[in-house]
């Protein structure tokens, strides 16, 4: 999915490389399919925390073992880094600091922001989402994620994607 950041126009879209490839699920549209976002929502967690005055890029967070009623997030490499700045936690996609930041901010605030950004499955699941949403414990579509990042590129100003109608488009294909 390719979006013009200034206009929010969708200028390129390939849902799958080969629609007729049954063996590799060619008929699944990767742009519209609901998938785990993994760590792709972490920038929004930190952006909201900064907006709410809960953190700055230099704020120190402890990256140490933690347990939230049985939910014990770990980093990808299963190592902990002690004290880290928010900017380092984001740059290295550290899981524990992201979960701690989300816990401090509150899941409802984060879920509300995701809904404002047009995350449809998040809206449907809003009552059952918890801290694991920081690590991909939710369902999103690529088009929603892409528009979230487009919103970052526009200084936080959200607009819905503009789907071009090829029959009305004067742009070359």
Task: Give residue ranges: language-model regions.
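Conserved catalytic neighborhood of penicillin-recognizing serine enzymes
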Residues: 55-110, 158, 169-173
């Amino acid at each position: 999915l390719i979006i013009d950041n200034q206009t929010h126009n969708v200028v390129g879209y390939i849902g799958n490389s080969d629609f007729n490839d049954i063996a590799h699920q060619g008929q699944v549209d990767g742009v519209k399919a609901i998938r785990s976002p993994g760590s792709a929502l972490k920038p929004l967690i930190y952006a909201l925390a900064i907006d709410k005055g809960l953190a700055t890029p230099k704020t120190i967070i402890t990256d140490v073992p933690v347990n939230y009623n049985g939910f014990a997030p770990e980093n990808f490499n299963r190592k902990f880094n002690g004290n880290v700045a928010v900017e380092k936690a984001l740059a290295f996609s550290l899981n524990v600091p992201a979960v701690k930041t989300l816990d401090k901010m509150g899941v409802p605030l984060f879920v509300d922001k995701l809904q404002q950004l047009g995350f449809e499955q998040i809206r449907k699941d809003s009552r059952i989402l918890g801290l694991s949403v920081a690590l991909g414990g939710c369902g999103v579509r690529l088009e929603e994620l892409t528009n979230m990042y487009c919103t970052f590129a526009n200084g936080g100003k959200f607009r819905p994607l503009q789907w071009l109608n090829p029959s009305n488009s004067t742009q070359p294909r």
